[in-house]
Amino acid sequence: MEKVIVAKARTVSQDMTTICCTRYGNVLCSRGSVVPLFINQIKEGKPVTVTEPEMTRIIMRLEEAVELVIFAFANAESGDIMVQKAPACTIEVLAQAVKSLFHSENEIKIIGIRHGENMYETLLTNEACA
């Protein structure tokens, strides 16, 4: 998607329109986030399912995502891809943290990586910076 945005940014008047993109990791508790799944599994007394314990994901709070958009409005130039530095965490550490918050004794069940999933999440590659 960023390539489309950057390409479009090159075709419009820089004086009148700024087209940029913000890129996030995983926004906690948003649609598609694994955290609500972990919470439901804990509340239902089921094992907490983890695809691959060492798989990493970049996590950010909703407030951080909103701050990134506001920062982009104030500072971006056309064609920019705005990325906030955010720490990566393993899925196992995230599952343990949710278990800890709920004082859960639920076991963690490793279910294996799914087709097409990446072991390590990267928000910005060297190629994207070029």
Language-model-detected regions and their locations in the chain:
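Mid/C-terminal beta-alpha module of Rossmann-like enzyme folds, strongest
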Residues: 75-130
